[in-house]
Amino acid sequence: MIEVQGLSRRFVQGRGRKARTVQAVDGVSFTAANGRITGLLGPNGAGKTTTLRMVAALLKPDAGRITVDGLDVAAQPQQALARMGVLSDARGLYTRLTARENILYFARLHGVPAEVAGPRVEALADMLEMRPLLDRRTEGFSQGERMKTSLARALIHDPPNIILDEPTNGLDVLATRSLRESLKRLRDEQGKCIIFSTHIMQEVERLCDQVVVVAQGRTVAQGTVAELSARTGLADFEETFVQLAFGGGAEPRPMAESAQAPAPLQGGFA
């Protein structure tokens, strides 16, 4: 379980006299439960990636608290990270290594014994339908193949919590469907707590047990798709989202996320 309480983060844009402070995240709160998929839904620049980077201990919040299975991310970052699988940017693969070697390398980083890591690679290959990829070098992989390898790396230490930042970006229809089915299995068969950010309505409707709508750096609504639609009285979920996020069509103010450091999640762990 991941709990986020009153999370805030500012960034300074520009230099000298042109410098200004932009509030990227402003009091975001939500709880992501075990055995459920929680979608962080918002327009570009809403603060989704910044929020997930703070959850993954890649950014320090200015205010607020994050706990992962009861562990305070600020006070116990290494212990919390050990209980998270973060889907790093697929460009972070080591292209001279095979998919298997990439996954096993991350197993060693997480301290997974070799006798445990080997069978886990095989099990993940079956679950993600990537067995033909295992012994190929990742250079030249398609976006979907890279995504599967990155997801396997994120899961190799069997974390109870999984974080994905817009995981279907750049994927074709078949790769998107494959990823969606994998996430369902992780939820239904293994009881994982899964958080993913997106701005795609269909992903939310098909996957999410809970939706957290973020706009202008704030949590503006949360609940199931049915509950959010009932709240607005609108049958179409896209219209529901527009009503909740923009008040029926108001333009969002510029956010730091689209102009500064919080690029897609990436780094030295997954």
Regions found by a protein language model. Name each.
Residues 177-190:
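Helical segment within the ABC ATPase nucleotide-binding domain
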Residues 104, 108, 115-133:
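Conserved ABC ATPase "signature" region
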Residues 64-75, 79-80:
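Conserved ABC transporter NBD signature motif
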Residues 162-166:
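Catalytic Walker B motif of ABC-type/P-loop ATPase nucleotide-binding domains
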Residues 222-223:
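ABC ATPase "signature
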